[in-house]
């Protein structure tokens, strides 16, 4: 007599919600945002996952922010909806709220209200408050009020678009320096 058992291993996520469009993972605190950065930067797949901010988030307690999607092999590819909320005191010398954002990603309805991205003496490339680098992502109704510094590809919203212009930026604006 032989028996076969099938086991499905489901990773426990640190956020409330199920990550679907109807029940996105909820980002309510700085700790939740750090957990998202850690998750994507550990090469976890974010494609087809949905995240929604449920409150304004102050990153003032962090000495420096590590962007979500720290390099081109760790791109964020999900949907992040700020729902009109803001990020305050974002300080990063390696990108913006997001680092590398890839095909399939949508970043929407979020503002970086204050902070410093890059440094006044920086000659490095790729700085943007919402994302430093995009490869086919959509940015909708995002805004920036932080100071963004860089010597190469630097922008208030996105530092560079590396996909032949297939990314879209719609309804976004910059009031930062």
Regions found by a protein language model. Name each.
Residues 9-177:
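Surface-exposed repetitive/solenoidal architectures
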Residues 1-5:
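Extracellular and select intracellular beta-sandwich modules with Ser/Thr-enriched
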């Amino acid at each position: 007599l032989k028996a076969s058992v099938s086991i499905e291993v489901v990773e426990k996520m640190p956020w409330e919600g199920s990550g679907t469009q109807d029940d996105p993972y909820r980002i309510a605190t700085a700790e939740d945002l750090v957990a998202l950065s850690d998750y994507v930067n550990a090469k976890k797949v974010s494609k087809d996952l949905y995240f929604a901010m449920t409150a304004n988030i102050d990153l003032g307690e962090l000495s420096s922010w590590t962007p979500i999607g720290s390099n081109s092999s760790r791109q964020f590819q999900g949907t992040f909806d700020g729902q009109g909320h803001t990020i305050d005191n974002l300080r990063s010398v390696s990108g913006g709220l997001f680092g590398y954002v890839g095909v399939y990603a949508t970043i929407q309805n979020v503002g970086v209200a204050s902070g410093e991205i890059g440094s006044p003496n920086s000659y490095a490339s790729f700085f943007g408050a919402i994302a430093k680098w995009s490869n086919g992502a959509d940015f909708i109704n995002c805004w920036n009020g932080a100071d963004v510094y860089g010597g190469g590809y630097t922008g208030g919203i996105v530092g560079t678009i590396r996909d032949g212009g297939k990314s879209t930026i719609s309804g976004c604006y910059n009031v930062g320096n």
